[in-house]
Amino acid sequence: MEKLDGLSLDLEKQNIYKLKELFPIAVEEGKINFDLLRAMLGDEVDDSKEKYQFTWKGKTKSIKLAQTPSAATLRPCKDKSKDWDSTDNLYIEGDNLEVLKQLQKTYYGKIKIIYIDPPYNTGEDFIYNDSFSDSLKNYKELTSQASSSNPESSGRFHTEWLNMIYPRLILAKSLLTSDGIIFISINDCEVENLKKLGNEVFGEKNFVGQWNWLKSKTPPNLSKKIKKNIEYVLCWQRGGNTNSFRGIQKTSKSDDPITKPQNSIKRLCFKPNTLKFKIEKGIYNKGIYGTEKFPNKLLNDLEIENFTNKNEVYFENRFIWTQEKLDSEIANGTDVKVSRQLVISYKKANYMPEVPPNLIDESVNVDTTENAGRDLKNILKGNLFDYPKPVSLIQYLLNFDIGKNDIVLDFFSGSATTAHAVMKLNVEDGGNRKFIMVQLPELCNEKKEAYKAGYKNICEIGEERIRLAGEQIKHQWQDEHPGEEFDTDIGFKVFELDSTNIIPWDNTAQYNESNLFDLSEVFKEDRTKEDILYEIMLKYGIFDKKVEQIDVNGKTMFRIGRRYMVVCLEDNVNSEDVKAIGELGPRVVVFKEDGFINDNAKINATYNLEKCGVEDIKCI
């Protein structure tokens, strides 16, 4: 019986595998021959010594950091969660670098939209200082301190920020769907570096654009030269996205002309009851009408009855539409109106959403940070978070190109505005989008209102915001739809990043004579069966599947998916137990290595389960 691998997805091996698939001739004894690879790529290889490149101290280590597999895990926290058994939303407490590695096996190529609002590197908001040797240990140290700064006087001001964001973007890219999109909020301190970095990670041709968001109408006087009231949102696509982005839905308060002076003359036929007139009844003889500047030629007599044309009528003019377009517009509910002078105009019932402009402000129904602060204060009953992003901003960005069942990820989730926006969007259009929030549990400053209100760290603020915002959305919907059932998912499962539950997988453990007996144990003493279960699901890449606790021959086991996996972490497992597991028809079965009643039961388990059609049998 094989043992389960305890590491996260190895991106380096994944990349090598892809190269071997594309260029098998360049593989010799299992390794890449780069001379052969260069020869096959021909002129596309740049061997010149002088070339344009974006580099900084620590860049190579940052790449290695992203590619180094992790043996950490995510432990379930049911007491912090809401609607655990029914929700598909996730809130993960932990360093996002480690968490992104843990998400790879399950969510590789599955996330449609990523939005992040990373630290802006203002000198005082910087807590992420990754350790190349042990990022999990480094995370534990980070969460025991209230803040960390990156002063400009350090001499590595931009370098530290680049080394922080680079490996995270590398990992984020692999999570995006083939038509996925990433939005990144930033200010002018790092916007230039971010654009260069994003172009390197996602490809310059996949840079969609830069939006300017009106952050504030009353910016502070921090400079003698300029008031800064703009922040930026940069966007890249994964590569396979050919969709037009959807901006706001245009509503026309006035009628639009159906003619243009520069257009060629066309003849259009208006079928009976397709024109709207201001007069109830009348007759127009064929002839020239309209105005002197914009004449309109009526080609046959027109009879009006009940404010519309009783007969088929023909006009000749410099129309903007063809006959086919006219018929289509009328079929879709467009009103074609005619004045007393027979000047023709139209008003659409529905306009296609406009491509979003590069300015984001109240003209597209997006609030400022002042509005966002007031809204958050109303939800949390206090000023608990500095400079939150407005829900309307995130919702506006998500609406550019999102389906009703897509997954949204925010791995710098802060006050959880993105989760709020996803829930609000779902209730508005009946969608079933899921969110994944990731946040470092950075300690609250003891002098701030959040700490005085009882919040120890930022995660507690974000989780409470999701709870209260979800209830607010639910109550508002119920007020507007009395008697109807509310079915939008406003719950979330909380997980926390931690070291592995499996002692043999923990390469950070220190052993001496006093604790050497622990080596005979498989699971850490303070870990539960559910901790171990979700670690198994992480390693198998099925972290998003539903879990059912079942009874098998009086033993408690777990079934993941309808017939995908059975996990047995019980002791004294015998042949009858194995037979009962096989009858459930799973594809995968995982046991505790020392859980069998004897060696024969363990040896026979593989044989008997394979006879039942089980494809994969592992132990831990």
Question: What positions do the PLM features span?
Answer:
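DnaQ-like (DEDDh/DEDDy) 3′-5′ exonuclease domain used for proofreading
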Residues: 1-115, 120-167, 591-598, 612-615
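Phosphate/ATP-binding catalytic cores across multiple sugar-kinase/actin-like superfamilies
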Residues: 96-99, 103-106, 164-169, 175, ...
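SAM-dependent methyltransferase catalytic-core segment centered on the flexible catalytic loop
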Residues: 108-181, 189, 230, 247-299, ...
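Cysteine-dependent PTP/DSP-like catalytic domain, specifically the C-terminal lobe
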Residues: 145-160, 209-221, 396-405, 424-503
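Signature of N6-adenine DNA methyltransferases within the class I
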Residues: 165, 178-179, 188-247, 251
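Active-site-adjacent helix-turn-beta-strand microarchitecture at beta-sheet edges
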Residues: 216-220, 226-229, 239-377
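Conserved class I S-adenosyl-L-methionine
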Residues: 405-414
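Conserved helicase/translocase motor-coupling segment
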Residues: 539-558
